């Protein structure tokens, strides 16, 4: 059932986006020929004021077709610039056209902002780690100061309760930071010159190896492991936390290992046989600490929501930058519709507020991707970019020039979509294997 809810949620986010284009087109007297919820052949359609409204079966999409979308094609065939109708997309000013393109992402931003406000006022439920840390890199520059299992109590005399608190009190710029740490019942204080980014590269949250769930037909299931079990060692190598496990599996060459785990105080040993080269065990670990943060007043909720939106957009822009500059590594994180629905479905199991919060972030991702991917004209950012350049030039590009830009952008867009589907399929195969 939660998969269906997640599909409907994704469809609703796209509906909000297309509604922005629709309303601004109506505002500027541009004829909306078709407004469709879903894609594919229509299962329900009706016409009001020269606009055909459709409901289509594939709810992982939707569109708003404005009059003038085929204008460039007509110009290309005629091999000359044609005069556009006043109620078409090419019959209005560049500025109005930019606003119509911008309206889709704008509505997603407004939707997320409003939802964040209500969630904050209702009491935000989310998950966090304790301030107990582990060293992510065995060659870490901070390993001389920190040890696996250290509990950070204070940073510059500011109390630390959760791992996310470290982001608030460790400066962005490299500077001298005082740490108060609890290590094996002993309080230790030391100074270290570090920036937040460098710190997070070297130090991560401590995650215990207590199993929350086991995937059917997985190596762990076949080995007899159950929820509540705690992994102790693999091939007699003691594993203290998830970082140890990830590091061990990353450097493992064998397909068969001996795993030891505890259950209700009793130690069990079993053979673990891997099905694929990625060494997927087939287990989910227990979630970190549950936190409830109550925002008491509207002004605080508005302020927190604004910074949450800005921070998310910065992360999206940085992700696009990584995709462009470090494609081989970043491309592994690209998800298609199946992966997106999977993420929403997983968040649903953590509670309704957490699920709604995830929907809001997904709405921000849709807005950010549409705005920042200016090289893809099928995205709003690409259309805005073209219209803005035409506004500066004082005249339109020739149809051939725009079509060349479209051809590259559509190819790149389809490539990203195909990459997302490939990653979705690979993820599904890993689960079923």
Swiss-Prot record:
The entry's keywords: Cell inner membrane, Cell membrane, Hydrolase, Membrane, Metal-binding, Metalloprotease, Protease, Transmembrane, Transmembrane helix, Zinc
Needed co-factor(s): Zn(2+)
GO BP, one annotated term: proteolysis
Subcellular location field: Cell inner membrane
Presence of keyword Cell inner membrane: yes
Residue numbers annotated as active site: 18
GO terms of molecular function: metal ion binding; metalloendopeptidase activity
Transmembrane parts of this sequence: 98-120, 334-356, 366-388, 401-423
Coiled coil: none
Pfam families: PDZ_6, Peptidase_M50
Gene Ontology cellular component terms for the protein in this record: plasma membrane
PDZ domain span: 193-265
Entry EC no(s): 3.4.24.-
Family listed: Belongs to the peptidase M50B family.
Protein name listed in UniProt: Putative zinc metalloprotease BB_0118
Protein species of origin: Borreliella burgdorferi (strain ATCC 35210 / DSM 4680 / CIP 102532 / B31)
